[in-house]
Curated annotation (Swiss-Prot):
All late proteins expressed from the major late promoter are produced by alternative splicing and alternative polyadenylation of the same gene giving rise to non-overlapping ORFs. A leader sequence is present in the N-terminus of all these mRNAs and is recognized by the viral shutoff protein to provide expression although conventional translation via ribosome scanning from the cap has been shut off in the host cell. Residues 35-69 form a propeptide. One of its GO terms (molecular function) is hexon binding. Cleaved by the viral protease during virion maturation. May cause the middle segment to be shed from the capsid. Keywords: Capsid protein, Host nucleus, Late protein, Virion. Induction: Expressed in the late phase of the viral replicative cycle. It comes from the Viruses. Belongs to the adenoviridae hexon-linking protein family. This is Pre-hexon-linking protein VIII. It holds the Pfam family Adeno_PVIII. GO terms for cellular component: host cell nucleus; viral capsid. InterPro entries: Adeno_PVIII.
Length: 139
């Protein structure tokens, strides 16, 4: 049995852009998560390490990438078109864990339940439409 040293968590404070966040939220975009914000480090002995970011790490047009190491394949014009092509109607269910489950449906769950669509959990419906809160093929 080999013991490895415990590596502490590194926290990075990201600069906030309220205008961009409001634009993304209004158009239904959400970065995974959605938990309540708060300071979880209550112990006076726990050290909080912050890494300053340079201005060049985040592009001023709001295009960013999570994970990976390659450059973004979108230019600002394509990104703007993508945002404006999204429906303007609000999504059903709000933003949070329910919307996350609705948008990232596991492909292995096709239709494991039988019965009318109202009896299915939303995350298991193959043709569930989050905009109209309906299932295609059912009236």
């Amino acid at each position: 049995l080999i013991k490895q040293p415990v590596v502490g968590t590194t926290h990075v404070e990201m600069p906030r852009n309220e205008v961009l966040e409001q634009h993304l939220t209004s158009h239904g975009a959400q970065i995974a998560g959605g938990g309540a914000a708060g300071d979880y480090f209550k112990s006076p002995t726990s050290a909080r390490t912050l890494i300053p970011l340079t201005a060049s790490c985040l592009r001023p047009d709001g295009v960013f990438q999570l994970g990976g190491g390659s450059r973004s394949s979108f230019n600002p014009l394509q990104t703007d078109f993508a945002f404006h092509a999204l429906p303007s109607r609000p999504r059903h269910g709000g933003i949070g864990s329910r919307q996350f489950v609705e948008e990232f449906v596991p492909a292995v769950y096709l239709n494991p339940y039988s019965g009318p669509p109202d009896s299915y959990p939303d995350q298991f419906i193959r043709h569930y439409n989050v905009y109209s809160n309906s299932v295609s093929g059912y009236s």
